[in-house]
Amino acid sequence: VISPADEETRRTGNRSAGGRRGVPKGAKELEIVLKEKHEMSARTIVTMPGDGIGKVVLPEALRVLDKVGFSASTVEADIGWEFWCTEGNPLPERTVELLARHKVGLFGAITSKPKTEAARELAPELQTRGYTYFSPIVAMRQLFNLDICMRPCRSFPGNPLNFIRKGPAGSAEEPLVDVVIFRQNTEGLYSGVEWTNPPAEVRAALATHPKFKAYADVSSADLAVSCRIFTRRACERIVTAAFEHARKFGYKSVTVCEKPNVIRETSGMMLEIGRAVQKGFADIELWNTNIDAQMMWLTKNPEDYGVIVAGNMFGDIVSDGFAGLVGGLGFACSANIGEECAVFEPTHGSAPKYEKLDPSIVNPIAMILSACMMLDHLDETEKAERIRRAIAEVIAEGKVLTYDMLKLPGGAGVIAKGAATTQQVTDAILARL
């Protein structure tokens, strides 16, 4: 259902790149949009299928939401590779305006490529306009300050992809994994403050650091520089959110996962703030691990961990590591939460090679679990729990499993080998609702 205001936004919305080298509106412009007195629905979800299998799995999540009686209007918004190629902007202004109006988005997946390859795929008439490709999901997080990313990684009993280790006397153990990663979502190495062939003023600033002497004889043409930016406010928000979640849901520890023994300033700030925040949560232990050691420990004793908090890149890494213990990216959901808006998405990519398979074989569970996180955010937790129980029952029964759960290589032939289709998995979940 599309409201008249939303239809007008989609029909007349700016289909150009906004005149700013493909970069979406700045914070000041967005603030104005957020404050506009739009005709606003309290329950309109902006759906963004995006690219590849995003177009396959998002409709499956909507089927499940409808089955549990979730009442909302939806408006589909444009995002992704198609709009980069045809407009020079993978995050069109009309999509930004819809998110600013309705505050809640459900997102599928995007295709993202290096900037030189992206430039070659622009429409010919756009190739001389100076557009530079950017990740629309990263831009969305920064534009709306969706600074808190939650990535729960929980094992479903009976999932054949669950982590199993050798126990005493060669017996098999399947530890219960129940971890929630809080990833700082807008800063760090993903902030996008970087240069190839850095300009003279950047080089001059770098030269003020004594350790840059090692690069004094390297020409700027041979240098690439990325800045790892942490701010105290962002660290305090993500660490506090992690501790509050741990207290609310009964986790006994919060682990700061960084690398302060080497990256002393930025990782050191996160750990320092972790220690300060923990003083207000005396019932919860503060642990700290280095990212490299954490990747070892998660494959040794994953059940030891409850809530983990990390910067942008390390949070990305450790959450994928834990996802691998509970079935892989087909089970990995996430929430991007800011003070004004929230967007919910599976963490998998667009897998374009599977987009046009008919019937589809991809696993819709990560997308459906992301929709559950949206329900939690909207205080519809009872509906979310019903869906999670239905998913658990389907997995435990073991009769309707996608190709990844059967450990089959992808491709059209997996159905003949017993793999369920995307729709069959959703149907099995619906039957238990």
Where are these regions (language model features)?
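Buried hydrophobic positions in well-ordered alpha/beta secondary-structure cores of metabolic enzymes
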Residues: D51-G54, K103, F182, A242, ...
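Flexible, glycine/charged-enriched surface loops at secondary-structure junctions
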Residues: A72-S73, F249-E258, F281-T289, E380-R388, ...
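Glycine-rich phosphate/nucleotide-binding loop
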Residues: F134, L298-V400
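N-terminal glycine-rich phosphate/adenylate-binding segment common to multiple enzyme folds
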Residues: C85-F212, V225, M313
